[in-house]
Every structure is written in structure tokens, then in C-alpha cells.
Amino acid sequence: MERVLIVNADDFGLSKGQNYGIVEAYRNGVVTSTTALVNGEAIDHAAQLSRELPALGVGMHFVLTLGKPVSEMPGLTRDGLLGKWIWQMAEEDTLPLDEIAHELACQYQRFIDVFGSEPTHLDSHHHVHMFPQIFPIVARFAAQRGIALRIDRQTVLNADDLPSDLRSTQGFSSEFYGEEITEACFLRILDASAHRGEASLEVMCHPAFVDNIIRQSAYCYPRLTELEVLTSASLKAAIAERGYRPGSFLDI
């Protein structure tokens, strides 16, 4: 059985080093798709690079934890900035859901303005779209626009009122992340997906060259390791041997 493999590089637009790393992993590696933070410092640079790579699928990386929002969000921001306190607010069930829904629409329009087209799919920075309170908002938004959505199905099992026409891959993995990133790790993800009988799989990654912005990230130098693994000729061959076809969210 032929299986579709989407290797999606998150954080397009975060910095020039991140952008160049993603492009390198696409041109000379196994990355097939990316998602962009429209409030990133290098988002215009990302859009410029993407115009040279029309086959690279570019989706939107919905942001509620970093930088400035596109719209006014007094209920979620502190001193005008987004941050990781969103986890505490989610636990306390005090999320400003109307603000979040409006911000999603504004970021989506910002994406269209910057890239000149709709995104191939949606996901989010730090997976905040998988919060039980937020997921129905994002799922309905994606379904209404006919675009795909990253779904961690272990989490979605607890969500109610999901659109029946929501598109996603059958499998998703965030395991290619951390301090122990190897080619063997990547291939274990593929083998586990094949064992489950999944016809499509998304693997999340964050390849980058380190610059001053990336150096400020808690997840810094492993991005270089990811880039090295993802551009390995042996990895590309091993993926093909397993019957996977590289694709984007336009293929599901």
C-alpha cells in the first residue's frame, strides 16, 4: 500500500535562520511542507522564499503563545504580548474564546495578504489548537474553508461536535523532537504508523540554522541536528523503501 508522508517544518517566519533551514531541508532533504507564523519577525522573508518554491506546501501556524497578536487581545495578552500563561488560563477555563476566534480569522487574513494565497492547512505553535476549548473553534474554521488541520487523534477523542468533513492525516507524530534526534528515531515513527495501517502520516519537525533569534529559544541547537538528519541521503532512501510517497496537505 502506498502511503503519503508529510514532513512538516514548523516555525516558518520565526527568523531568517529558521527560514533558511526549512528551505534547505526542502531542497536537499525530506521536508515537503511548512507552517508559517504570521507574526514572526521574518514572515516577509519567508513569503519571499516561498515564491521561489511553488511546490512547497505552506500552511498557517496559529500563534497564541509568542509575540504580538494581529488583533487586540486584552483578555489573553500581558503588556500587549502573548505568552505561555495560556496553559494556566486553559486549566482555569478562563480563555477568552471570542478573542481567540477573532484572532484566528485575523491571522488567516494576514497569511493571505503576505503569501498571496490561502494556506494549505492549519496547525499551531505549541499545539494550542488542541486545547479542548480551542479545538472546536479551529476545527470549524478549517472545515468551513475546506483546508486541512493537524490533529493529534489521541486528544481529539475527548472533543465534541467535530465537523464531519474535517480533513487531516490519519497519523501524526511529534516524536522527532528533543535531544535524541536520529535517523533511527524518524524511521521508527514511520514503522509504527505503517503497523497501525495509516495511509497518511504527518511528522512534525523544526530544522533551522542558528541565528540570534533561534539562540533565544529553549529549543535551539537540536534544530541543527534535525536539519542534518532530514537532509541525509540515507533517510530519503529508507523512506522510499518503506513505500512512502512524499506529499503535502493538498494530497489528502
Swiss-Prot record:
Pathway: Glycan degradation; chitin degradation. Its cofactor is Mg(2+). Keywords: Carbohydrate metabolism, Chitin degradation, Cytoplasm, Hydrolase, Magnesium, Metal-binding, Polysaccharide degradation. One of its GO terms (cellular component) is cytoplasm. Mg(2+) binds at residues 61, 125. It catalyses: N,N'-diacetylchitobiose + H2O = N-acetyl-beta-D-glucosaminyl-(1->4)-D-glucosamine + acetate; diacetylchitobiose-6'-phosphate + H2O = N'-monoacetylchitobiose-6'-phosphate + acetate. It is found in: Cytoplasm. Its EC number is 3.5.1.105. Belongs to the YdjC deacetylase family. ChbG subfamily. PANTHER family: CARBOHYDRATE DEACETYLASE, YDJC DEACETYLASE FAMILY MEMBER. Involved in the degradation of chitin. ChbG is essential for growth on the acetylated chitooligosaccharides chitobiose and chitotriose but is dispensable for growth on cellobiose and chitosan dimer, the deacetylated form of chitobiose. Deacetylation of chitobiose-6-P and chitotriose-6-P is necessary for both the activation of the chb promoter by the regulatory protein ChbR and the hydrolysis of phosphorylated beta-glucosides by the phospho-beta-glucosidase ChbF. Homodimer. This is Chitooligosaccharide deacetylase. It comes from Salmonella typhimurium (strain LT2 / SGSC1412 / ATCC 700720). The gene is chbG.
